[in-house]
Amino acid sequence: MNTLNFLVQKDKIQHTVLRETPDLPLADGQVRISIDKFALTSNNITYAAFGDAMNYWKFFPVAADANDVAAMGQIPVWGFGNVVQSSHPGVAVGERLYGYFPMANSVVLKPGRLTPASFYDAAPHRAELHAVYNQYMRCNVDPFYTPESEDVQALLRPLFVTSWLIDDFLADNAFFGAQQTGTDAKMGEGGVALLSSASSKTAYGTAFGLKERAGIEVVGLTSPGNVAFCESLGCYHRVLTYDQLDAIAADRACVYVDFAGNAKLRLAIHTRFANLKYSCAIGGTHVENLGGGKDLPGPKATLFFAPSQIKKRATEWGAQEFGKRMVQAWFAFTKVACDPAKPWITVAHHAGASAVTAAYADVLKGQGDPRVGHMLSLSRAQ
């Protein structure tokens, strides 16, 4: 048997290749997972864009091939898989798992730190990587899990967890002085939270939480073609295009939550808003315009790392309370986002190598319908 892998060139992520590798016999303590399906979103493009800086390439390292013209990498994705072989006494064949997988049709893991709810991949190369990404949830006891919502879980769960943590991080820090309680955000009063790439799932998940905070106006920034979609969500007080920054008074206290990673936009915001309190860099949906944050006016652009906030809150609240709050927030969000009468997301399925390649190219361009979420599979038939 062979494993089919979807690889990208690390320094030119628009260049891709499909490569088969022979399956080796399992060592003691290993399991083989058939990766059933996985989500592909702008968040995964961020993983690739920051692959070296944030160690995303290290999760599923790619051995060099004689035909490679440059170093290749495997983008991590969130999805579901089934245990098809096991040499570990604590993991049974047939178990369904949710977690962090490569863009492939199978993967070998080495379960460690087993509990009834989950295990961690204890492979040596992942020991230095953050535990949040090494955990695999056992679906039969996962509090997030319902069989009918698997696609939505794969598409939105990791993004919403990040969104929830960004909202919590900003509130935890009192919006770095931008929040002005006693003001009416609906009237354009108080501080401002500017969210770029407002149509992205992580951005609107963040806005969903932020809008409930007093004293802060949530303003989504997007391209002209996505204004109507963003406005239809109802989670932004206002939606503006990227060239409408002058619609916000230059002296208003604000924080910038940058999902786009667009260097020109970041410079424009840092230059216009003299009372910018904090600049939070989340990702890079605008891959063609990624740039650094050096020599900017105002505060330094600071990369948000979700596991740090997880660790802080788990310490303060306790792991059980942290998990309880996160699950409650998830179901509150999906109740709105998955309302059949007005869904925020519809699912498109892409099965087979050619379909996966085409879907990746579309997501990389960042010009698709923001209401569509892409579920991919290299194990299902076309």
Regions found by a protein language model. Name each.
Residues K211-R266:
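Adenosine-nucleotide cofactor-binding segment
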Residues L26-F38, D52-V108, R113:
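Glycine-rich beta-strand-centered segment in the early N-terminal region that forms part
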Residues Q9-F38, S42-N44, A49:
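A short N-terminal beta-strand-loop micro-motif at the entrance of redox/enzyme domains
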Residues Y100-G191:
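NAD(P)H dinucleotide-binding glycine-rich loop of Rossmann-like/cofactor-binding domains
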Residues I310-Q382:
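C-terminal hydrophobic helical "lid"/dimerization subdomain
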Residues V192-S197:
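Conserved N-terminal Rossmann-fold NAD(P)-binding element of oxidoreductases
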Residues A203-Y204:
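N-terminal Rossmann-fold NAD(P) dinucleotide-binding loop
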Residues A268-V336:
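Glycine-rich phosphate-binding loop and adjacent beta-alpha segment
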